[in-house]
């Protein structure tokens, strides 16, 4: 069967699980030590900071999916349920300097924490979709209802920390906003918010190629009134005689200060990470290669929360989220007993070239297992990226 020709009159059941962890700085060995609970050595902290970039990015995306679909020659309808955990950050090198050493190594110097963020989001999504096929075109959309479970968001617009030579003056000039949902739970359907999402796709077919544009998960969650919102700015600590260097992370120091925080009881909106894709799928002239694909992925993800939905600006989702435009290629090779799909990608949250593969067993009923980061098997604890993909498809 032509790889670009869809089946008709089929009812499919899809089950999938997709886990991706990507970083441009954090290795698995370092991650294990950071969360092991053991005391970090000075040597570890120094080596960790010396290997950092100016911008340090990390992302975890874990999705479990169940979908039903019916398709004939004219249209396709679908119903699906997704549970998703999405965390990401983009932090300056000085942020980790501050966390590990406080201000003890920045006397007469300024630490710069500008344009940093941390975000963690968990939600469920129920989608209904419909697509219509014309002669050489296919147009589709999906409408989703969102159940917001948990949200943690901290956004640093501007932040500097200056410590004077004799440590009698500490100047913190910053603009920080944070929010978190009041009740945390890992259980399904813990409703701390509600929202909607939209998917759009457009497909154009020619004799040997298909061109596809997709917008996935454009939407937002309105969190319930029990969210805790905080903002703060501009703090000066001065006029006290100090006889020894102060570590700003010392709990006694922090407890003796009084930072003004402003609690907001207004609405809280957060947006989903929205994927925008452009894909060209071409038939292969080589007998055992079904098709070759090249694609471009972009991420629109505002890293802060909003009190009004009208406050959002398109540029908010294009910068600071740490995702670089990604290009990838994928081929489908028929080896009789299974399909072998090598994948090459560059961009995203990683600065490296990533090598992946998918293995698909079966035809109408199939099982697929794959990874976007086979290099992690060779690098093991030194790897920055880990991923695994599982899919079970049943056609009736």
Give the predicted meaning of each segment.
Residues 52-60, 116-122, 188-194, 268-274, ...:
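Short sequence motifs at beta-strands and strand-loop junctions characteristic
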Residues 63-67, 125-129, 197-201, 277-279, ...:
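Membrane-embedded beta-strand positions in outer-membrane beta-barrel channels/transporters
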Residues 17-23, 81-87, 145-151, 197, ...:
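Transmembrane beta-strands of outer-membrane beta-barrel pores
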Residues 9-17, 75-79, 137-143, 198, ...:
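Transmembrane beta-strands of outer-membrane beta-barrel proteins
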Residues 4-188, 224-256, 309-317, 367-372, ...:
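A subset of solvent-exposed loop/turn segments in beta-rich extracellular surface proteins, enriched
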Residues 49-53, 187, 290-317, 331-350, ...:
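Transmembrane beta-strand segments that form the barrel wall of outer-membrane beta-barrel proteins
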Residues 384-396:
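Outer-membrane beta-barrel "beta-signal"
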Residues 69-72, 81, 132-134, 202-206, ...:
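Residue-level signature of outer-membrane beta-barrel architecture
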């Amino acid at each position: 069967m032509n790889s670009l020709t869809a089946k008709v009159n089929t009812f499919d059941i899809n089950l999938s699980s997709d886990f991706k962890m990507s970083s441009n700085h954090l290795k698995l060995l370092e991650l294990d030590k950071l969360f092991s609970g053991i005391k970090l050595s000075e040597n570890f902290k120094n080596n960790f900071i010396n290997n950092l970039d100016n911008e340090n990015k990390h992302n975890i995306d874990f999705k479990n999916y169940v979908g039903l679909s019916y398709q004939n020659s004219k249209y396709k309808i679908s119903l699906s349920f997704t549970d998703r955990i999405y965390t990401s950050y983009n932090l300056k090198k000085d942020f980790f300097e501050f966390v590990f050493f406080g201000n003890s190594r920045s006397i007469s110097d300024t630490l710069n924490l500008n344009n940093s963020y941390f975000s963690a989001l968990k939600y469920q999504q129920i989608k209904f979709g419909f697509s219509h096929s014309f002669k050489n075109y296919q147009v589709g959309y999906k409408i989703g209802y969102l159940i917001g479970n948990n949200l943690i968001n901290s956004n640093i617009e501007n932040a500097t920390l200056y410590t004077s030579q004799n440590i009698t003056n500490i100047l913190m000039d910053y603009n920080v906003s944070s929010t978190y949902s009041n009740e945390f739970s890992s259980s399904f359907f813990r409703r701390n918010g509600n929202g909607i999402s939209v998917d759009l796709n457009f497909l154009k077919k020619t004799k040997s190629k298909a061109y596809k544009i997709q917008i996935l998960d454009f939407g937002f969650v309105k969190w319930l009134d029990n969210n805790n919102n905080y903002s703060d700015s501009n703090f000066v600590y001065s006029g006290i005689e100090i006889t020894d260097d102060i570590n700003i992370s010392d709990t006694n120091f922090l407890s003796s200060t009084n930072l003004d925080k402003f609690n907001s009881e207004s609405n809280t909106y957060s947006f989903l990470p929205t994927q925008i894709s452009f894909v060209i799928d071409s038939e292969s002239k080589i007998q055992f290669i079904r098709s070759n694909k090249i694609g471009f992925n972009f991420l629109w993800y505002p890293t802060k929360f909003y009190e009004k939905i009208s406050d959002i600006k398109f540029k908010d989702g294009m910068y600071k989220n740490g995702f670089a435009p990604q290009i990838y290629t994928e081929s489908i090779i028929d080896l009789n007993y299974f399909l072998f799909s090598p994948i090459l990608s560059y961009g995203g949250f990683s600065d490296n070239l990533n090598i992946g593969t998918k293995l698909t067993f079966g035809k109408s009923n199939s099982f697929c297992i794959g990874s976007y980061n086979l290099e992690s098997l060779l690098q093991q604890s030194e790897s920055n990226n880990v991923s695994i993909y599982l899919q079970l498809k049943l056609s009736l």
